[in-house]
C-alpha cells in the first residue's frame, strides 16, 4: 500500500472514511512523528470536554418542566440552571482555539521548514502532497472556526429558550383544584424577545455555502454572504399557541396545550442535539485528520532532510 498516494487522494477529496482508515494505519508506516490521542490531549485538544458539557446542556434543557395539576394538586415546574450553558460555550471556544493553535504550529514549525528545504528556492520540486497539506490545514482552520461559532450561537439560543421556559413558572398558577390560570400575554412577550434577538453567526470568508447548508439542514438558514440565522418557526408556533393574560383553562385543556407547547420545545432540543452530534463527528474528523497530517509531515520532513544531505 502506498500510504502517501492514498493520503493525497483522501485529503484532496476530503474522504473522511479514508482519512479515518489511514489514521489507524498511519502509526505502522510513519514512524515516531505520528501523533496519538494522548498527544492531542496533551496539546489541549480533548474533544471529550466540550462534548460532555454540550451533553449536559441537552440534559438540563430536557429537565425543564411546566407546572401542572395532578389529582387536584398543583405541582410546580422545574427551572433550568443557566450556568450549564455558559460552561458549554466556554468549553467549545477553548477547544476550537486549541485545535487552531495546533494546526498553526504545524504550519509554521513543520510545513514552513519543509517548503524552505524542498521549495523552488532550493531548485527542488516539492513533494506533490505538500500543497494539499497546506490547503487542508487552511480548510481545517476554517471548519474549526465555523463550527465553534455556530455551536456557540446555537447554545446561546438554547439557553435563551431554557430561560423562557423557566420564567413561565411565574405566569402559570392554579386557580383551584380543577383549573389553571395562564398569563399568556406576558409569556408571548418573553418568546418574542427571544425571536427578536436570535443569534446571527458569520461563516469564515471563502466558506463553501452550499456545503454548510447541506451540513446544517433546515434548523438554520444561510445567506449567500454566509450569515447563519436560526429558524424561528418553532418559537413562533409556541408564541401563537398562547392565550391572553388571565386566561383560565380546565386541567384537560391546559394539559393539551402543555403537551403541544412542550412538543415544540422538544423539537428545538432535537435540532440542537442533531447539531451537537454533527459537531462530535467534526471533532472525530479533526482528530483523524491530525493523525494523518502528522504522519505526512513526518514523511515530508524526512524527505526534505534527505534532499539537504545530497
From Swiss-Prot:
Any Gene Ontology CC annotation: extracellular region
Secreted in keyword set: yes
Coiled coil feature spans: 127-171, 250-299
Main location: secreted
Cell compartment(s), UniProt: Secreted
Annotated keywords: Coiled coil, Secreted, Virulence
Pfam families associated with the record: T3SS_TC (PF06511)
Origin superkingdom: Bacteria
Gene3D superfamilies: IpaD-like
Domain notes: The N-terminal domain is an intra-molecular chaperone that prevents premature oligomerization of the residues on the coiled-coil region that are involved in interactions with the needle and/or itself. The residues in the C-terminal domain probably form oligomeric structures at the tip of the needle that are responsible for the regulation of secretion of other effectors.
UniProt record similarity statement: Belongs to the invasin protein D family.
Function: Required for invasion of epithelial cells, as well as for survival within host cells, escape from endocytic vesicles and subsequent actin-tail formation. Probably regulates the secretion of effectors BipB and BipC and their final integration into the target cell membrane.
Descriptive protein name: Translocator protein BipD
Amino acid at each position: 500500500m502506498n500510504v502517501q498516494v492514498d493520503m493525497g487522494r483522501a485529503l484532496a477529496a476530503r474522504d473522511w472514511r479514508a482519512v479515518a482508515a489511514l489514521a489507524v494505519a498511519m502509526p505502522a508506516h510513519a514512524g515516531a512523528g505520528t501523533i496519538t490521542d494522548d498527544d492531542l490531549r496533551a496539546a489541549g485538544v480533548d474533544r471529550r470536554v466540550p462534548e460532555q458539557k454540550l451533553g449536559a446542556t441537552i440534559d438540563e434543557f430536557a429537565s425543564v418542566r411546566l407546572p401542572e395539576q395532578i389529582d387536584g394538586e398543583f405541582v410546580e415546574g422545574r427551572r433550568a440552571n443557566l450556568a450549564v450553558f455558559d460552561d458549554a460555550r466556554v468549553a467549545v471556544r477553548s477547544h476550537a482555539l486549541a485545535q487552531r493553535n495546533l494546526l498553526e504550529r504545524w504550519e509554521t514549525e513543520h510545513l514552513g521548514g519543509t517548503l524552505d528545504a524542498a521549495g523552488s528556492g532550493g531548485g527542488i520540486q516539492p513533494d506533490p502532497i505538500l500543497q494539499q497539506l497546506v490547503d487542508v490545514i487552511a480548510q481545517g482552520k476554517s471548519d474549526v472556526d465555523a463550527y465553534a461559532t455556530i455551536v456557540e450561537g446555537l447554545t446561546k439560543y438554547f439557553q435563551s429558550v431554557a430561560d423562557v421556559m423557566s420564567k413561565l413558572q411565574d405566569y402559570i398558577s392554579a386557580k383551584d383544584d380543577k383549573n389553571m390560570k395562564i398569563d399568556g400575554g406576558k409569556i408571548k412577550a418573553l418568546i418574542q424577545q427571544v425571536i427578536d434577538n436570535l443569534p446571527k453567526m458569520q461563516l469564515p470568508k471563502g466558506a463553501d455555502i452550499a456545503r454548510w447548508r447541506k451540513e446544517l439542514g433546515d434548523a438554520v438558514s444561510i445567506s449567500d454572504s454566509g450569515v447563519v440565522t436560526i429558524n424561528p418557526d418553532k418559537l413562533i408556533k409556541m408564541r401563537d399557541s398562547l392565550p391572553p393574560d388571565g386566561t383560565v383553562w380546565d386541567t384537560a385543556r391546559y394539559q393539551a396545550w402543555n403537551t403541544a407547547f412542550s412538543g415544540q420545545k422538544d423539537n428545538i432540543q432535537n435540532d440542537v442535539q442533531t447539531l451537537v452530534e454533527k459537531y462530535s463527528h467534526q471533532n472525530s474528523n479533526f482528530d483523524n485528520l491530525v493523525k494523518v497530517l502528522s504522519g505526512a509531515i513526518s514523511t515530508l520532513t524526512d524527505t526534505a532532510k534527505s534532499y539537504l544531505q545530497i
